Each structure stands twice: as structure tokens, then as C-alpha cells.
């Protein structure tokens, strides 16, 4: 397995992977999300590749105060092999190298499988309520 930075030629394969991982939401246009990331610190957008196939992703961010991780997904046929752990570990190292003191991840409360993985990796539940406000309406995907 190789973990590397996203490249333009990964575009369609990544969107297909996100569909398989059930990461797409009607209110988010994944093509726009990728375009936006490519224009703003693509070095934190990582893919895991096995035998030339993209099997995992994580899209990281850092605002100078906190890091974040989005679009963490692993192809269903490749789960249980430590790929998500490796992606998060690499992202964490990149954030630490920038002086990032903390990373936050938003997870649906009912996603027990993923919550368990994050807890095993040392993530703790923060008594915070995540609020959001859409500033630009994407077309429904």
C-alpha cells in the first residue's frame, strides 16, 4: 500500500470510491469539494493506493488553530487492513509538522463502527455541538 497526495488523474476514481463508501450527501457536490481542495492546500488530501487502485482517502485541513479530517473512506473490500489508520496517521504527521496542536473530526453519532475506530486511535468525544452554515449553494449532486 502506498499513501500519497491526491493527483488530478485520481478525480473520477476518488468520486467512485466515495460513492462506494456512502460518503456523498445531496447537499455536497464532490466534484466541487475536490476542485476547492485542489485550489487550497492539496498536500493534505491523501489517497491510499493498492496495486494502482485508489482504495482510501482522507481530506485534511488546517486553519492555523486546528486540523480537520473529512472524506475518510476505505473501499469496502479493503476494510480491516489498517488503511484508514494509516491515512489518519499520515495526515496527523503532516499536521504536526505544521505545528497543529489538535485535530477534530465530525462523525455522525449513530456511526458506531467508525466511532470505535476513532476511539481506538486515541480520539475522544468532545462535548461540543457542531454548527454549520452554508455560504455557497452547490448544485444538488
From Swiss-Prot:
Coiled coil: none annotated. Its EC number is 2.3.1.-. The keyword Transferase applies. It holds the Pfam family Acetyltransf_1. It is an enzyme of class 2 (transferase). NCBIfam families: PRK03624.1. Belongs to the acetyltransferase family. YpeA subfamily. This is Acetyltransferase YpeA. It comes from Shigella boydii serotype 4 (strain Sb227). The gene is ypeA.
